[in-house]
C-alpha cells in the first residue's frame, strides 16, 4: 500500500473488505491496521464505499483497490487504485468537495493512460485558448485530463450545480477539450442510466378504424413512451408515461393522419 506519510510503498497486514457495485464491479478496500479493530476499519470502509460507488463506471473501470490510511495527506490516483487519508477526507467533506476530489483521482486511475498523451487530446489542448486551472497549465500531461474531466462532468451532466457564468467560462476556455470528451461515448452509469429498448411482442395496425395496438415486454415500475415518426429522424410522443403493467404492457390509440407512411418506437423512461 502506498502511504503518503512516509511517501513510500509499505507492507501492511491490512483489513480487507469487498465492495460490490451494480454492473458486476467489485473493488477491494484495504484499510491500514492502525485502525486497530475490524469494526473500526469497517466504519472507514463503509464511509467511502458508497461515495466511490456514485462515480460513473468510466472512472471505476481501472480501479481495483482502495487504500485507506489515517493522516492529513492528499488523496491519490493511479496504480489501479484510489488512495485516501482520513483526516484529509474530513477536510474535503467539510469543504463539500469529497466527491469532486474522488472524480479527479479516479480520472488519473482510469483515463490518463488512454487519453493524456493521445493525438486527439493533444490537438484539443493546442486548439483551446487556455487551461482550466493553473494546476493543469503547470502539469499539462499529468493533470490536465483530471482537471478538465471534472468540469466537463459538471457542464454536461450537472449544470444545475454550477452558475451560468462559470459554465460559460468553462465552455469558452476549453471548447475543444469538452468536445473531445463528448466524442468518447463514456459509460456514465449510474449518473446516466442507459436507454433500454423494450422487446416488441405484438403490433397491429387497423387502417379501417385508423388505430394501432402495441404489446411489449416490460419491467416492473418502469414508464414507457410510444413515439412516431414519418422519416426515422424526427420523433414525437404519441403516448407518454405509460406505466408498466407487469412483464407485458400494451396500449392502443388512434393513428396520426395525413401521412403515407409512419414508424413507431417504444422507449423506456425509467
What are these model-predicted stretches?
Residues 96-115, 146:
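Active-site recognition of the HExxH zinc-binding catalytic motif
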Residues 84-101:
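Short pre-active-site segment immediately N-terminal to the catalytic Zn-binding motif
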Residues 52-59, 105-106, 110-114, 153-157, ...:
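Sec/Tat-exported extracytoplasmic proteins
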Residues 194-270:
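Short, composition-biased motifs enriched in small/polar/acidic residues
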Residues 71-75, 88-93, 108, 116, ...:
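Solvent-exposed loop/turn segments at secondary-structure junctions
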Residues 75-79, 109-124:
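A structural motif
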Residues 123-195:
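Metalloprotease/metallohydrolase-associated module, dominated by Zn2+-dependent proteases
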Residues 1-82:
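Auxiliary, metal-adjacent structural segments of Zn-dependent hydrolase domains
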Amino acid at each position: 500500500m502506498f502511504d503518503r506519510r512516509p511517501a513510500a510503498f509499505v507492507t501492511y497486514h491490512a483489513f480487507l473488505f469487498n465492495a460490490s457495485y451494480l454492473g458486476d464491479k467489485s473493488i477491494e478496500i484495504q484499510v491500514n491496521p492502525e485502525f486497530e479493530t475490524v469494526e473500526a476499519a469497517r466504519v472507514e470502509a463503509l464511509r467511502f464505499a458508497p461515495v466511490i460507488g456514485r462515480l460513473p463506471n468510466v472512472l471505476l473501470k481501472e480501479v481495483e483497490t482502495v487504500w485507506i490510511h489515517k493522516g492529513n495527506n492528499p488523496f491519490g490516483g493511479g496504480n489501479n487504485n484510489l488512495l485516501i487519508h482520513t483526516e484529509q477526507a474530513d477536510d474535503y467533506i467539510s469543504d463539500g468537495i469529497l466527491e469532486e476530489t474522488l472524480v479527479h483521482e479516479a480520472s488519473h486511475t482510469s483515463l490518463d493512460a488512454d487519453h493524456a498523451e493521445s493525438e486527439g487530446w493533444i490537438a484539443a489542448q493546442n486548439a483551446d485558448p487556455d487551461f482550466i486551472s493553473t494546476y493543469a497549465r503547470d502539469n499539462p500531461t499529468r493533470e490536465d485530463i483530471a482537471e478538465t474531466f471534472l468540469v466537463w462532468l459538471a457542464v454536461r451532466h450537472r449544470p444545475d450545480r454550477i452558475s451560468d457564468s462559470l459554465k460559460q467560462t468553462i465552455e469558452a476556455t476549453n471548447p475543444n477539450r469538452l468536445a473531445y470528451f463528448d466524442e468518447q461515448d463514456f459509460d456514465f452509469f449510474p449518473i446516466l442510466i442507459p436507454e433500454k429498448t423494450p422487446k416488441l411482442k405484438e403490433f397491429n395496425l387497423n387502417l379501417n378504424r385508423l388505430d394501432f395496438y402495441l404489446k411489449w415486454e416490460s419491467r416492473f415500475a418502469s414508464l414507457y413512451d410510444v413515439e412516431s415518426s414519418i422519416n426515422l429522424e424526427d420523433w414525437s410522443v404519441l403516448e407518454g408515461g405509460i406505466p408498466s403493467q407487469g412483464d407485458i404492457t400494451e396500449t392502443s390509440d388512434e393513428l396520426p393522419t395525413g401521412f403515407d407512411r409512419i414508424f413507431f418506437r417504444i422507449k423506456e423512461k425509467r
